[in-house]
Amino acid sequence: MSLVSQNSRRRRGGRANGRKNSGKGRPAAVPGPAVPRDRSDPQILQGLGATEGPGTSVLPTPRGGSSTSVPPTASEGSSAPGQLITSEGRNTSQLPTSRKGRGTRRPPAVSAGLNAAASITASEGASTPVLPTAPKGSKASEHLTISEGASISEQPQSHEGPNVQPTLGEGSGTSVPPTFSEESGISEPLPSGEGLSISVSPTISEGAGINEPSPASKAPSTSVPPTASNGLGINLPPTSSEGLSISVLFSASEESDISVPPPSAEGLSTSMPPPSGEVQSTWVPPIILEGCSVKVRSTSRKGRRTPVRSAACESPSPSAECLSTSLSSISAEGFCSSLAPCAEGSDTCELLPCGEGPSTSGLHDLEEESSISQMPLAAEGPSASGSSIEDENPEEALSCGASVGMNLCKCTSLALQKADDPSVRPKRAEGFLDFQVLRDSENSNSITIMGLGTAHVALTLKPQDPMEQNVAELLQFLLLKDQTKYPIKESEMREFIVQEYRNQFPEILRRAAAHLECIFRFELKELDPEEHTYILLNKLGPVPFEGLEDIPNGPKMGLLMMILGQIFLNGNQAREADIWEMLWRFGVQRERRLSVFGNPKRLLSVEFVWQRYLDYRPITDCVPVEYEFYWGPRSHVETTKMKILKFMARIYNKDPMDWPAQYNEALEEEAERDVPNNWRAVPHFRRPLFQEVSPELLASDSDAPGCPSKYSPHSWPESRLESKSRKLVQLFLLMDSTKLPIPKKGILYYIGRECSKVFPDLLNRAARTLNHVYGTELVVLDPRNHSYTLYNRREMEDMEEIMDSPNRPGNNFLMQVLSFIFIMGNHARESAVWAFLRGLGVQNGRKHVITCRYLSQRYIDSLRVPDSDPVQYDFVWGPRARLETSKMKALRYVARIHRKEPQDWPDQYREALEDEANRAEAGRRPLVVRNLR
């Protein structure tokens, strides 16, 4: 007889026995005391329904062997939730027939499709549905196996109290799920202790699988997650405590859909139809506890698992975005799981994102005192979820350092990812959630917050209760969100607080603000009371925009300051057309995308508006519609009108008092800022990006001694000077991407040879624009050839070596070539440099290309060796190399490669120290462009 026929006969026999033993002689279709009338009836059960009374429901007993597995029984007052175990490929259940192997109990049925078996776990608590079992000596099991399809085996449940007295021990039951292996499965149930039900997770292996539960005792219970191996897989869970339920289930199907709903109200069992979709789906009805109602919605898509979310009436459940403490969750690349702290009477549900590959998440009961429900949210690959049941009094805190049956690292890293479905997980801002919350596995109360943005921050807290854990999570979110310069919404902050503590949000926010003030010197300020948005401010006072100019955002901040200045000079409002006309004078075109700003139009009308630096309002009664720019609330908080006025005065080479109305308004604003709080601004602790150059030094070359000029720079009209300087700025920005020096002849050829009369004045105008707007300095690279280049002093000071870029091929060789020249005595023969590059693995034709490029970019210069025949050349450092790096950096680079200290080269180290001293002295002098003739 084929396996399919045997399975079909067992299934028909099981249904017949269920109808025979259900009710007191009534047909199953006739409504009775134990038969539900509609789907809302609390007595709806999935599988076989057992009625109230002493009736016994016995599962069909296969004929082929001497012993089978006994489904788990529950002691008096125990509750049992249903769980699913799904595998792909061969499935071996505990059926009586034994064909081969050593003393094993193995089923004869092996299917080629998806097989699922439902196991029941019991825990001490209120009376809930209990699986009816056969009397002592009888052994029954129901496993429906369907070839090339999904197979579901479900145990019947009763409604009120147990219908069958326990037969194994005193009120105990042991359920051994099948062991999944490609060859054979061996499962041996062992005697159990008192009031205990153990559900053992399957072992995944390519060889033989052995699953042996340990004898139950009164010791604390633990759960052993499934293990994966290439050989023999053995899964031995430790002993369990009295009345404690341990359940871990595993799903190993690529496209199967498994959802385990959380527990809800007592005595209520609801069976829900399986979700529809393109793939096989398996469903387990929720076991409802006291005080909650469950709304189940699930959808199924091909290749994805959709979790079931619960809506509790009295006990809310936090969603996946709540940062709960992280313990263990096995994904395709590592281990990470999660436990959420529970308050009294609450039921916690958490969604965990899972990567590709087998993934497991397990939860544990906390000695009759906690209620936790966990559901996985899988991406592509098998997933598993475990659930636990609340007993009496939940603990207020969980130990986040304990490992759950697996070896974890010293610290577990939790990274939040964006939700794929906004209906399942709350929507949050994109692109800023790169951070780590590090927890010490030995000290469960130690949390270290690390920011991974441009501003690295670290904070170690040791919260003693869940309140402090929520404070730590909120603090990390505030620090990372502030780096984006977008206002922080109160609704976003609430998402990072566990749901049962959201009613204490004001206290959590107050504690987080205290940490920000004491540790990071930031003030949490409410930006808009109506929208409940906040920003972080430096406690040292309103921050000038120079202090906010980080390396990537420096040019954008300079552009923003010009816009704010134009708005202020125009009467605190400015039309969009006037703003673009002003920016056009400085080389910023509306439709032209520059690498510095990206899309200027989007930067002004979208990014600065979202960051609340600007307000963008339409003008009423205007056809077609025009817009005006105003100062945004963030600009009023972070800067002052006097600072913006001084900034505009530097750009136009004027004095702030040249605008008397705006100067008086700025003075009044400063007085208003000082009087209410009797507060004076303290200079910002960061070094400003640009050195302020005195007007005497910025004067034209005609005023400079030693540089006479017979042409007056003021002989040209102002509009023509602005037009030529704007064209010059565009030339420098375009040539800066190539890193090639710009000679004076090339500049005059581009802007016109007639500009040689006013060249110094044009150069100084362009230098001021490049300095204040774009954050770069225009410097003389070679005084003899009158070549110029752009230089970012702050960027080069922070860099240990010259960074790589698409326009600088082989920069990894550049630092090595410069270091080689320095070690060789500040000059090296061309043949020696090529031999050095050949030793680094550079191809023959590539060496000449690299050195020629470095020569053209003025990183190295070539000097002819006197009296050499044939002619030979020495390579020395060029002016750009001396500008962008230093001898000390080159020496440190060599020492790092050779794993030595810079002092190991004493002569070069002494020379590098002298070079550093000379650079420090030269850095105190302002860098001014001169027209050297």
UniProtKB/Swiss-Prot annotation:
InterPro entries given in the database record: MAGE, MAGE_WH1, MAGE_WH2, MHD_dom
Domain MAGE: 467-666, 721-912
Keyword set, alphabetical order: Cell membrane, Cytoplasm, Membrane, Nucleus, Repeat, Tumor antigen, Ubl conjugation pathway
Matches recorded under Gene3D superfamilies: MAGE homology domain, winged helix WH1 motif, MAGE homology domain, winged helix WH2 motif
Pfam families named in the record: MAGE (PF01454)
GO CC annotation: dendrite; nucleus; perinuclear region of cytoplasm; plasma membrane; postsynaptic membrane
Biased composition (Basic residues): 8-23
Positions with biased composition (Polar residues): 64-97, 149-166, 173-184, 219-236
Domain of life: Eukaryota
BP terms from Gene Ontology: negative regulation of transcription by RNA polymerase II
Annotated compartments: Cytoplasm, Perinuclear region; Nucleus; Cell membrane
Record region (Disordered): 1-113, 149-236, 256-282, 360-393
Keyword Kinase: no
Region annotation (Interaction with DTNA) ranges: 719-933
Chief site of localization: cytoplasm
Entry function: May enhance ubiquitin ligase activity of RING-type zinc finger-containing E3 ubiquitin-protein ligases. Proposed to act through recruitment and/or stabilization of the Ubl-conjugating enzyme (E2) at the E3:substrate complex.
Subunit and partners: Interacts with DTNA. Interacts with TRIM28.
Protein name according to UniProt: Melanoma-associated antigen E1
Organism of derivation: Rattus norvegicus
Gene: Magee1
